[in-house]
Amino acid sequence: MNTQIKFTTPEEAVKVIKSGDHVHLSSVASAPQCLINAMCKRGEAGELKDVHVHHLHTEGPAPYADPKFEGVFQLDSFFVGSNVRKVTQSGYADYIPIFLSETQKLYRCGAVPCNVAMIQVCPPDKHGFVSLGTSVDATLAAVECADYVIAVVNKYVPRAFGQAMIHSSKIDFFVQDDTPLIEAKFSEPNEVETAIGKHCAALIEDGATLQMGIGAIPNAVLSQLSNRV
């Protein structure tokens, strides 16, 4: 990787993507929307074909999964979120079934190539370190294995430490975009969801350790545990 930081535009950065490449997108709130949009513009212009897109759950639009991009982008996701559920169920997009803890192994063992990793990071500190913030999961392995790493520098990305910290020398192109991170917003549980939450909460003992998923039912369960210890 280059040690020289390169600041550029999204349109210039995504020019490193070639037909047939495998592209990783960072997850959830860290989905790099400005890079995604720039990549899709290249697809619309007929500059790309057979590009494989990999990611876990992402928030926000997933324009590369639109059937109009058949033959241009192939979605091979590690998680089926609401923004790609319909196209996956229709058979247009593919899902790779795997445990979350093992997704990084796909890149490290070479089972899934990674030519370009498109990520979001916080601004670099005085030592040149940035943080992956809300998306470490498979993104760290993608950064380590990719031929090119394109990072959106966003002041709203939290500076998480530990394995989330990477040095800017690992990044080939920096793009500035301070768009607030996308939030997952849920409505209040309805009558059925509340009833399910009550039944589940009754089975949970005080002092229990919980692993919660995403969505209305986990939120309904948690809402019934406010007076528990």
Question: Positions of the model-derived regions?
Answer:
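Conserved alpha/beta enzyme-core scaffold
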Residues: 1-229
